Amino acid sequence: MRIGDLEIIQILDGEWTTPAAPGLPDLDPEAAAVHSNYILPDGKMSAQLGAFLVRTGNQVVLLDAGLGPSAQGCGHGDCGHPEHQMKPQMVEAEVEEFFRSKGAPEAQVEWFTNMLRVQKLEHGWLEDSLTKAGVRPDEITDVVLSHLHPDHMGWVSRDGASFFPNAKLWAHQADADFFLSDTAPDETTFKLMLGVDSTKSRMKPVHNQIELWDRDCTVAPGIDLRHMPGHTPGSSIAIVSSREERAMMLGDVIHCPLELVDSEFAIMSDIDPAMAKRSKDILRQEIEGTNIHVSSSHFPGLEFGRLLKGEGKRYWAWS
């Protein structure tokens, strides 16, 4: 995707197939065709894992950092992990116990345990994707973490050492306070579902590289960060601007285009759903009917699109 003088390069890290999210709306045939690259015929949903690379001025900026090296873990289902193959019921029982202990609704418990049965996860591609883009990890000057969930910060370290040794790691203060403090949340869910270590443990080797921000700011010429909380306390988006053109990388403020089209539909993963809905509403109002191209680290192929409006309804068009 070219925005004025800047090129945004998609950096793939993996793909995650899960059961369809609860509340997925019925789509007419025309709309279903538009969203068919991630809402699959068998009723499952496909989500990409990845990041975006932008060269600007003297900086090489990576927006998000994927789930991480595959050696750190794997998904359940068809992952091939011996423990998951031998004892899937044990993993499901742990997930059920974890969610019930947190007071989760039974429908949420059922969905997550079903996801463990049918999900398919492949990851660990980011290093090769950077190579294909002609960039070495030590050439990255800035890594912007849209938030500190493990599928967005996963490559910050590998085997206890920094993967981007010369980069500033941009994280919002509110997320650092939430995920990296002594009172950090229990990340059992992610470990069971994705097979990865906690955010806190993976950020520990790069503590001295973290660049905290608490007000909307500029990372590099043409790249600005905006706080849009709800999914996590410090959830944010990145805005790339050049020659009066704009694109937005939405992190997990939006997981899939259907969340933009249908204001009543939301992927069930926001820490503060009410605040997340407000952020989504603000975003829709800003981009609807404009030439602003948007993507997220989970859109199919990390492709961009626009939110349009016609005949009294919103619809999605791929760029």
Where are these regions (language model features)?
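Short, conserved loop/helix-junction motifs that constitute active-site signature segments
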Residues: 160-166
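Metallo-beta-lactamase
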Residues: 1-135, 139-151, 166-227, 244-251, 275-291
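Active-site metal-binding loops of divalent metal-dependent hydrolases
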Residues: 13-14, 65-68, 148, 174-175, ...
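Hydrophobic/aromatic beta-strand patches that form the interior of the parallel beta-sheet core
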Residues: 9, 144, 170, 211-213, ...
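Cap/insert and terminal regions of metallo-dependent hydrolase folds
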Residues: 83, 93, 101, 109, ...
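Active-site glycine- and acidic-residue-rich loops that bind
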Residues: 149-153, 224-237
